[in-house]
């Protein structure tokens, strides 16, 4: 039930392990800090990490007459979360499903969850361009997907997959809001200097080549990793960090694009 959702944004990545879920959760927290009501939908059925990243593991979801009730992170209900992780008895349990069953579950997440009035719904997708992505696009045809943020790392093998992601967006008519380059350099936890351990600026070069916005470059920052397992925003804990700067830039960009 997406009728009360004003803006829907999908977060995509060409490969797994690029930090897409971390970007999704911290973006959701940053939007909430800016006064927006936010929903975060984790449709990475085989690797749901959002409950862990937000410290919500073990929380239960319930059904009401209007559908599933998402898990809220706060009493004010400013951030609602739904993930298959809430349906698994143990975090280690694998989801061994064929395509049709995955498709059915994603349709349920998109049509049977009682999302209240939201300014933004962030959809954290699995890596690649699979059945899950096609199902999401089909379900969003009526209400519309308002844009996609693509997360990549600077290595060439990751950038190759992002090119496929860009092609997927163009073929399905998704507006690309921009590319985020993650894990670009390592921030020393003692002196906070940044050292490039991989190549750098690949995201910016790809954004220029594809003629889409480059939203920013995020380094590997151990201080950000410590926030996993809580609902603490980087903007609160590390306001002077590069990560907070990039997230603030993305939020400001979204505020100029969308009318809340």
Curated annotation (Swiss-Prot):
Binding positions for [4Fe-4S] cluster per the UniProt entry: 188, 191
Domain of life: Eukaryota
GO MF terms, alphabetically ordered: 4 iron, 4 sulfur cluster binding; ATP binding; ATP-dependent FeS chaperone activity; metal ion binding
PROSITE patterns attached to this UniProt entry: MRP
Localisation per UniProt entry: Cytoplasm
Cofactor: record remark: Binds 4 [4Fe-4S] clusters per heterotetramer. Contains two stable clusters in the N-termini of Nubp1 and two labile, bridging clusters between subunits of the Nubp1-Nubp2 heterotetramer.
Complex formation: Heterotetramer of 2 Nubp1 and 2 Nubp2 chains.
Protein name: Cytosolic Fe-S cluster assembly factor Nubp2 homolog 1
